[in-house]
């Protein structure tokens, strides 16, 4: 319902219990999903790669959350999941602080964790139910992210509203929303007669402001994957001034197509595209990009090398905040 589509394209659904997704001793389902993501990312043609990985509910310990976060980060997908279903804002703050889920590890930038579960349906008193049925918010948020421009965070009154959701587990005051948001969670809020997400945060709390903001991470991952795909198609061409000029022209053309108020980035500059003078099979590419939010400048650094197999090229990316 939140995808605003009659039918969602390019989706894979895995029928698994939470116990199966959190079993590190017998990681059959973890390995299956990891292999599915890798199969569509670790290849030359990236047109069928995934963008979102949704695991509704609470994964539990940091060992499990980090396992999934590393899988998401290594395949450049955004993991959406949920914190525990607790009954008060104070419980969320206390338990999340003690759980220590946020951190400065780079893979935390690929994790979105919601809190304050959504009302699924009212309790049925006639059959002895004592509480309403509450469901995790990550799936609804993922649908909204799917249908929203990648550079726009799904948060606030205009863009964060969720379809067909009547209420949440508990009400939140403005100060409580701010405290929960600062911790790295995405609270679900019932205000203005609608339920909405009210944060743009990932679980990354390091110095790089862009990696704290999921729209920036998604845009950078998308740009990196497009460039990986494009450069893979140009692998093993002899490096000449004409090759360099042609690559630069094509990259600028792509970046120009995603620049502007209704697109993905505010502005860009290709700072470097060159062959490593000391290692001829290595290509270095630095792009200076300013996303719309936050209003900071960042550098995407791509490094490519010829692989061991014919027609194989290995690419690595790094996102750094411009000083």
Segments predicted by a language model, with ranges:
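Structured, hydrophobic secondary-structure cores that serve as assembly/anchoring elements
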Residues: 39-323
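Long, low-complexity, polar/charged, intrinsically disordered or flexibly structured peripheral segments
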Residues: 1-32, 37
């Amino acid at each position: 319902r939140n995808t605003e589509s009659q039918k969602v394209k390019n989706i894979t659904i895995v029928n698994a219990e939470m116990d199966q997704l959190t079993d590190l001793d017998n990681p059959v389902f973890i390995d299956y999903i990891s292999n599915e993501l890798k199969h569509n990312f670790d290849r030359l043609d990236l047109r069928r790669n995934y963008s979102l990985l949704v695991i509704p509910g609470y994964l539990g310990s940091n060992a499990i959350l980090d396992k999934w976060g590393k899988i998401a980060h290594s395949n450049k997908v955004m993991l959406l999941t949920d914190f525990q279903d607790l009954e008060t804002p104070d419980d969320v703050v206390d338990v999340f602080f003690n759980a220590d889920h946020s951190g400065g590890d780079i893979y935390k930038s690929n994790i979105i964790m919601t809190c304050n579960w959504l009302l699924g349906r009212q309790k049925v008193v006639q059959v002895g139910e004592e509480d309403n049925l509450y469901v995790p918010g990550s799936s609804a948020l993922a649908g909204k992210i799917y249908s929203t421009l990648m550079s726009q965070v799904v948060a606030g009154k205009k863009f964060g509203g969720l379809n067909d959701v009547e209420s949440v587990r508990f009400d939140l005051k403005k100060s409580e929303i701010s405290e929960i948001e600062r911790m790295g969670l995405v609270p679900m809020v019932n205000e203005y007669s609608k339920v909405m997400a009210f944060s743009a945060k990932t679980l990354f709390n390091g110095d790089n402001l862009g990696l704290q903001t999921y729209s920036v991470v998604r845009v950078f991952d998308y740009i990196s994957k497009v460039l990986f795909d494009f450069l893979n198609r140009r692998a093993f061409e002899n490096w000449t001034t004409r090759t360099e000029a042609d690559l630069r022209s094509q990259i600028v053309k792509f970046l120009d197509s995603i620049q502007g108020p209704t697109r993905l980035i505010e502005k860009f500059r290709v700072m470097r595209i060159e062959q490593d003078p000391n290692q001829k099979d290595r290509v270095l590419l630095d792009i200076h990009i300013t996303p719309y939010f936050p209003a900071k400048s960042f550098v995407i650094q791509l490094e490519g090398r010829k692989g061991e197999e014919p027609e194989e090229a290995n690419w690595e990316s790094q996102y750094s905040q411009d000083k």
